[in-house]
Amino acid sequence: MPELPEVETVRRGLQPFMEGATVVRVEQNRPDLRFAFPENFAERLSGRRIEALGRRAKYLTVHLDDGLSIISHLGMSGSFRIEAEDAQGLPGGFHHERSKNSLHDHVVFHLMRSDGASARIIYNDPRRFGFMLFAEKGALEEHPLLKDLGVEPTGNLLSGEVLAALFKGRRTPLKAALLDQRLIAGLGNIYVCEALWRAGLSPMRAAGSVAGEMDVMERLAGAIRSVIAQAIAAGGSSLKDYIQADGALGYFQHSFSVYGREGKPCRNPACGGTVERVVQSGRSTFFCASCQT
């Protein structure tokens, strides 16, 4: 399932083609994905101007000129394909074969861009686990999917001081705390494993046990911010079914230090340990017991 960097990569790929464009019409090829499409989905979007594309945690948000917003989630295998005259100029050249399989094209947005050029934005989802829902004018932040989300782990919003306040008194393992979307929004299994390795912290350690150590909290906050920023710059992890908006595979997976590297040498040159795998709450955790304490 795509994590925050993958969704941000998709947002940035779609942005030049969607922002400022007018929706000419929408082809809706089935009544539902994970959830049913909103009533009159295609009709309500026709003629609307797209003001901005945003992201909250792992959700893509599309803001329209009448105040209506679309909340979209890519699910396990969702992707957007761009068909436009200048689309070939984007990285990847739109050559990913799966994204061109029209059998799973469930929604097609026909757009007229501000420069007069046309574009088609196609949502493809073989597993149909993604979704598109509406948030009415003024109700986006209070939407049930968004209202309880925690702080974003990007920019300067996440600091050691913020982490200390979030972790204080918590007995849950550090990894579980970092995956709690009510505390920090958008972190997933891959990048939590990587951030904990960079910070030198055991994923099994109780979150509250380090809340009072500000140097440790600052180190962890910095590790989270840097791993997310680097993943976004690299185009996301592209594991399994995830692909970018332009159809190209990302390459951050080549930089993984622990994730998926069970039994391989730790990449900390001062360590000499071996990457281990354990299961926490049904998910694989990769870490180095030698340098993560």
UniProtKB/Swiss-Prot annotation:
Chain residues that bind DNA: H104, R127, R170
Gene name of the record: mutM
Domain of life: Bacteria
Task performed by this protein: Involved in base excision repair of DNA damaged by oxidation or by mutagenic agents. Acts as a DNA glycosylase that recognizes and removes damaged bases. Has a preference for oxidized purines, such as 7,8-dihydro-8-oxoguanine (8-oxoG). Has AP (apurinic/apyrimidinic) lyase activity and introduces nicks in the DNA strand. Cleaves the DNA backbone by beta-delta elimination to generate a single-strand break at the site of the removed base with both 3'- and 5'-phosphates.
A GO molecular function held by the record: damaged DNA binding
Cofactor: Zn(2+)
Pfam families given in the database record: Fapy_DNA_glyco, H2TH, zf-FPG_IleRS
Taxonomic source organism: Brucella ovis (strain ATCC 25840 / 63/290 / NCTC 10512)
Protein name: Formamidopyrimidine-DNA glycosylase
Assembly, per entry: Monomer.
